[in-house]
C-alpha cells in the first residue's frame, strides 16, 4: 500500500491535459533580469569621465575664487579647512561602506609624516601661485612638474625617456614660454600700474617654480615611501590629510594674522558665506576627484583615463577664461592650445610605453601603485 501511494504521488493524469492543444512547443527561454537602472548608469563610461572632469574643474575654480579675494592671506587656514572636510567626507564614506582604507596606525604615521610635510609644501606653494597667476597660466606651468618627475625617476629609479616623451616635454616648455610672454605683454599694454602688475606676475612665477620643485619631490618621495607602507588610494588620502591638520593649525596661528581687522578683510560680510562654502566645496572636490578617477578606470580603462587626464587640461584652462577675468588674447589662447597638444602627446607616449615590455624604459605614468593614485596626484596639482 505504501508503495502504491508513493507511485500515485508521481502519476501524471493524462485526462487532465488539454487535448485541444496539439502544439507542444518548447517553453520560451527565461528572460534574464536586467540590472537595476542605477547599476546600468554607474557602468556607463560617459558618466565617470564627465564626473572626473567636473570635479577637477570644480576644485580649481573654487580655490581660485577663494584665493582671488582682494585681501585674502589665510592660505594655511584654507588648506586646514580643506583637510578637515576631506577627513570628515572619507570617514563618512567609510562608515557608509562606499570606500575602505586602513585604520590609523602610529608606526605607519611616523613613516608617512615626511611625505605629509612635502605635501604641505606642495599645496601651500600651489595656492600662492594660483593666487597670483590666472588659471590658464597656472595649468600650463603645472605641466613642467611632469618633466621634473620624469628626470627624477631617471636619476633615482633607473629609467629613461623616449623620443615621443621628450617631444611632449618640448611642447610643454614652449607653451609655458608663450603663456608667460602673453601674460607680461597683457600686463604692460593694459591700463593701470604696469610695474605693479608685472611684479605680481613675477611673484606668481617664483611661487610656481617652487611649487614644481615641491610637487616633484612629493611625488618621487611618495613613490619610494609607498613601497614601504603598501598604501592604497584612500590610505594615502587619509594619512595625508589627517597628519597635515595639526601642522596646518600650528602654521596658521603662528604665521598668519588672526586679528579681527584681518579676519574682516579676508571674510567681508557681503561674501563671507560664499567664501566659506567655496572652502568646503574645494575640500570635497579632492575626494570627488579620487573617487571619480577610480570609477573612471574601473568602468573604462587606464588608457582611457590617461587620455581623459590629458584632455582635461583644456576645460580647466578654459574655466579661467569663463569664470574669471583672465585675458583672452591670441598668445594666451595659443599657449592653451600648445599645452593641450603637449598633454595629448604625453598621454600617447605613456600609452605606447605601457604597451611595450618593461625593458628599463621610464614608466612615465609614475608608480603604478593603484588605479587612482595618479588621480589623487592630479587632484593635488589641479
From Swiss-Prot:
<feature type="compositionally biased region" description="Polar residues">
    <location>
        <begin position="367"/>
        <end position="382"/>
    </location>
</feature>
<feature type="transmembrane region" description="Helical">
    <location>
        <begin position="328"/>
        <end position="348"/>
    </location>
</feature>
<dbReference type="InterPro" id="IPR013657">
    <property type="entry name" value="SCL35B1-4/HUT1"/>
</dbReference>
<dbReference type="GO" id="GO:0005794">
    <property type="term" value="C:Golgi apparatus"/>
</dbReference>
<dbReference type="Pfam" id="PF08449">
    <property type="entry name" value="UAA"/>
</dbReference>
<keyword id="KW-0762">Sugar transport</keyword>
<keyword id="KW-0812">Transmembrane</keyword>
<feature type="transmembrane region" description="Helical">
    <location>
        <begin position="111"/>
        <end position="127"/>
    </location>
</feature>
<feature type="transmembrane region" description="Helical">
    <location>
        <begin position="201"/>
        <end position="221"/>
    </location>
</feature>
<feature type="transmembrane region" description="Helical">
    <location>
        <begin position="72"/>
        <end position="92"/>
    </location>
</feature>
<dbReference type="GO" id="GO:0030659">
    <property type="term" value="C:cytoplasmic vesicle membrane"/>
</dbReference>
<feature type="topological domain" description="Lumenal">
    <location>
        <begin position="128"/>
        <end position="134"/>
    </location>
</feature>
<feature type="transmembrane region" description="Helical">
    <location>
        <begin position="234"/>
        <end position="254"/>
    </location>
</feature>
<feature type="topological domain" description="Lumenal">
    <location>
        <begin position="325"/>
        <end position="327"/>
    </location>
</feature>
<keyword id="KW-0256">Endoplasmic reticulum</keyword>
<feature type="transmembrane region" description="Helical">
    <location>
        <begin position="304"/>
        <end position="324"/>
    </location>
</feature>
<feature type="topological domain" description="Lumenal">
    <location>
        <begin position="183"/>
        <end position="200"/>
    </location>
</feature>
<dbReference type="InterPro" id="IPR050186">
    <property type="entry name" value="TPT_transporter"/>
</dbReference>
<dbReference type="GO" id="GO:0000139">
    <property type="term" value="C:Golgi membrane"/>
</dbReference>
<feature type="topological domain" description="Cytoplasmic">
    <location>
        <begin position="152"/>
        <end position="160"/>
    </location>
</feature>
<feature type="region of interest" description="Disordered">
    <location>
        <begin position="358"/>
        <end position="382"/>
    </location>
</feature>
<feature type="topological domain" description="Cytoplasmic">
    <location>
        <begin position="296"/>
        <end position="303"/>
    </location>
</feature>
<comment type="function">
    <text>Involved in the import of GDP-mannose from the cytoplasm into the Golgi lumen.</text>
</comment>
<feature type="topological domain" description="Cytoplasmic">
    <location>
        <begin position="1"/>
        <end position="40"/>
    </location>
</feature>
<feature type="transmembrane region" description="Helical">
    <location>
        <begin position="41"/>
        <end position="61"/>
    </location>
</feature>
<protein>
    <recommendedName>
        <fullName>GDP-mannose transporter</fullName>
    </recommendedName>
</protein>
<feature type="topological domain" description="Cytoplasmic">
    <location>
        <begin position="222"/>
        <end position="233"/>
    </location>
</feature>
<keyword id="KW-0333">Golgi apparatus</keyword>
<dbReference type="GO" id="GO:0005458">
    <property type="term" value="F:GDP-mannose transmembrane transporter activity"/>
</dbReference>
<feature type="transmembrane region" description="Helical">
    <location>
        <begin position="161"/>
        <end position="182"/>
    </location>
</feature>
<feature type="topological domain" description="Lumenal">
    <location>
        <begin position="255"/>
        <end position="274"/>
    </location>
</feature>
<feature type="topological domain" description="Lumenal">
    <location>
        <begin position="62"/>
        <end position="71"/>
    </location>
</feature>
<keyword id="KW-0472">Membrane</keyword>
<dbReference type="GO" id="GO:0005789">
    <property type="term" value="C:endoplasmic reticulum membrane"/>
</dbReference>
<feature type="topological domain" description="Cytoplasmic">
    <location>
        <begin position="93"/>
        <end position="110"/>
    </location>
</feature>
<dbReference type="GO" id="GO:1990570">
    <property type="term" value="P:GDP-mannose transmembrane transport"/>
</dbReference>
<keyword id="KW-1133">Transmembrane helix</keyword>
<feature type="transmembrane region" description="Helical">
    <location>
        <begin position="275"/>
        <end position="295"/>
    </location>
</feature>
<comment type="subunit">
    <text>Homooligomer.</text>
</comment>
<dbReference type="GO" id="GO:0015297">
    <property type="term" value="F:antiporter activity"/>
</dbReference>
<keyword id="KW-0968">Cytoplasmic vesicle</keyword>
<feature type="transmembrane region" description="Helical">
    <location>
        <begin position="135"/>
        <end position="151"/>
    </location>
</feature>
Amino acid at each position: 500500500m505504501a508503495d502504491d501511494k508513493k507511485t500515485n504521488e508521481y502519476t501524471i493524469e493524462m485526462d487532465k491535459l488539454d487535448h485541444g492543444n496539439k502544439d507542444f512547443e518548447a517553453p520560451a527561454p527565461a528572460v534574464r533580469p536586467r540590472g537595476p537602472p542605477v547599476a546600468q548608469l554607474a557602468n556607463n563610461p560617459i558618466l565617470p569621465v564627465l564626473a572626473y572632469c567636473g570635479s577637477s574643474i570644480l576644485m580649481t575654480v573654487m580655490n581660485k575664487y577663494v584665493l582671488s579675494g582682494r585681501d585674502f592671506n589665510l592660505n594655511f587656514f584654507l588648506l586646514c579647512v580643506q583637510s578637515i572636510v576631506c577627513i570628515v567626507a572619507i570617514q563618512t564614506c567609510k562608515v557608509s561602506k562606499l570606500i575602505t582604507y586602513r585604520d590609523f596606525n602610529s608606526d605607519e604615521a611616523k613613516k608617512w609624516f615626511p611625505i605629509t610635510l612635502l605635501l604641505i609644501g606642495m599645496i601651500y606653494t600651489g595656492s600662492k601661485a594660483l593666487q597670483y597667476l590666472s588659471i590658464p597660466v597656472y595649468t600650463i606651468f603645472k605641466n613642467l612638474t611632469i618633466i621634473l618627475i620624469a628626470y627624477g625617476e631617471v636619476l633615482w629609479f633607473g629609467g629613461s625617456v623616449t623620443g615621443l616623451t621628450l617631444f611632449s616635454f618640448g611642447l610643454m616648455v614652449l607653451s609655458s614660454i608663450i603663456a608667460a610672454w602673453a601674460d607680461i605683454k597683457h600686463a604692460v599694454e593694459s591700463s593701470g600700474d604696469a610695474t605693479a602688475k608685472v611684479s605680481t606676475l613675477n611673484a606668481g612665477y617664483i611661487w610656481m617654480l617652487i611649487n614644481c620643485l615641491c610637487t616633484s619631490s612629493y611625488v618621487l618621495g611618495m613613490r619610494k615611501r609607498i613601497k614601504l607602507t603598501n598604501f592604497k588610494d584612500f590610505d594615502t588620502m587619509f594619512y595625508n590629510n589627517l597628519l597635515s591638520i595639526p601642522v596646518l593649525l600650528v602654521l596658521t596661528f603662528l604665521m598668519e594674522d588672526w586679528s579681527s581687522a584681518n579676519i574682516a578683510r579676508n571674510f567681508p560680510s557681503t561674501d563671507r558665506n560664499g567664501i566659506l562654502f567655496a572652502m568646503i566645496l574645494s575640500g570635497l572636490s579632492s575626494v570627488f576627484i579620487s573617487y571619480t578617477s577610480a570609477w573612471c578606470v574601473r568602468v573604462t580603462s587606464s588608457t582611457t583615463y590617461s587620455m581623459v587626464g590629458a584632455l582635461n587640461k583644456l576645460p580647466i584652462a578654459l574655466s579661467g577664461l569663463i569664470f574669471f577675468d583672465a585675458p583672452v588674447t591670441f598668445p594666451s589662447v595659443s599657449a592653451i592650445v600648445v599645452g593641450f597638444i603637449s598633454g595629448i602627446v604625453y598621454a600617447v607616449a605613456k600609452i605606447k610605453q605601457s604597451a611595450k615590455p618593461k625593458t628599463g624604459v621610464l614608466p612615465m605614468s609614475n608608480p603604478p601603485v593603484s588605479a587612482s593614485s595618479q588621480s589623487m596626484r592630479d587632484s593635488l596639482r589641479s
